[in-house]
């Protein structure tokens, strides 16, 4: 609902629609259904609300008060949210008075101070084995639930060093290359848009005219999550989600303008509609990354979206139709 309210008034161009339907954005959790119950969903909702409050038409102090009081709660829900703070700083800098940079930086530092104190407190107070046992027993006593993977990771990966060791023990050249290609293809429409975007007024001490450089700087911290998480599919989804939401905010509020080269995709859609639709289908619904670093690329995303949605709404109880058919066997053996 928040996402719909945010994107419904966007300026229309074909490439933006393609970027929204990237398989590493809103289609990803529908293909990998377990992602819908992950903590990052709360981060996405919190960030969308921040973007709505950050509209130039609204009072600027509203978004700053929101950051001061709500962002620490998001950090308590999931600590790695701190890696995505640069997107917030980027938006606050754009909304600030460019002629009062020092004052603007002070305000941003002040509204983020609560988040920095929260993350420092979390770092210096890691979860002890005794506290983990209390939590584990509480899950069983109150909800009848065992301490499964996410709960046990709070114990085995409570230190910062343990976060990085898990990745180093699982990384392979194949996995690295696979996710490089995933990001290259998944980000391709958005990066074309960003490359062809220009600020309507010069940004940050009048040094930046194009969006590409400041946006690339914003991505430096989130990319570090690849060294601390083995769920690389989720990392790609989170980085892309924050990236495209930020871009959509800029274009929705008329803070950037697009180069006419982007209109080529509108021309391509009008003149070669059938070819364009086929390519769009393959790009958006033909594949998606798996959750784990060792997972291969999934296919038949559109089928999985329909199957997973129907299974949970109609209670199919995980019965797979046609699982022994020659077509499915051929797909598993030669395509997947």
Which stretches of residues belong to each language-model region?
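Membrane-interface alpha helices of multi-pass inner-membrane proteins
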Residues: 63-91
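Perimembrane helix-loop-helix junctions
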Residues: 84-113
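Aromatic- and kink-enriched transmembrane "portal" helix at the membrane-lumen/periplasm boundary
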Residues: 19-45
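Transmembrane-helix motifs of polytopic, lipid-linked glycan transferases
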Residues: 1-11
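Short hydrophobic alpha-helices at membrane interfaces in multi-pass membrane enzymes
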Residues: 56-73, 102, 106-107
């Amino acid at each position: 609902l928040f996402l719909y309210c945010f994107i419904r008034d966007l300026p229309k161009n074909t490439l933006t629609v393609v970027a929204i339907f990237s398989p590493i954005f809103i289609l990803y959790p529908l293909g990998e259904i377990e992602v819908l119950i992950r903590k990052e969903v709360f981060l996405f909702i919190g960030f969308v609300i921040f973007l709505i409050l950050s509209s130039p038409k609204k009072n600027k102090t509203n978004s700053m008060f929101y950051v001061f009081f709500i962002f620490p709660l998001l950090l308590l829900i999931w600590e790695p949210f701190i890696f995505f703070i640069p997107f917030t700083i980027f938006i606050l800098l754009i909304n600030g008075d460019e002629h009062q940079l020092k004052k603007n930086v002070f305000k941003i530092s002040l509204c983020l101070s609560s988040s920095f104190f929260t993350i420092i407190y979390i770092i210096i107070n890691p979860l002890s084995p005794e506290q983990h046992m209390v939590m584990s027993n509480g899950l069983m006593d109150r909800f009848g639930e065992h301490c499964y993977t996410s709960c046990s990771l709070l114990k085995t990966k409570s230190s910062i060093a343990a976060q990085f060791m898990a990745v180093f023990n699982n990384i392979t050249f194949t996995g690295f290359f696979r996710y490089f290609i995933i990001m290259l293809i998944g980000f391709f429409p958005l990066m074309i848009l960003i490359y062809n975007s220009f600020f309507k007024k010069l940004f940050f001490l009048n040094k930046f005219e194009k969006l590409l450089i400041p946006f690339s700087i914003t991505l430096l911290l989130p990319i570090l999550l690849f060294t601390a998480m083995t769920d690389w599919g989720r990392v790609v989804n989170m980085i892309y989600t924050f990236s495209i939401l930020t871009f959509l905010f800029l274009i929705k509020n008329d803070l950037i303008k697009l180069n006419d080269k982007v209109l080529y995709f509108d021309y391509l859609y009008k003149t070669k509609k059938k070819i364009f639709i086929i390519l769009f289908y393959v790009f958006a619904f033909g594949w998606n990354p798996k959750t784990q670093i060792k997972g291969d690329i999934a296919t038949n995303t559109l089928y999985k979206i329909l199957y997973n949605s129907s299974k949970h709404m109609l209670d199919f109880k995980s019965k797979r139709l046609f699982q022994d058919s020659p077509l499915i066997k051929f797909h598993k053996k030669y395509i997947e």
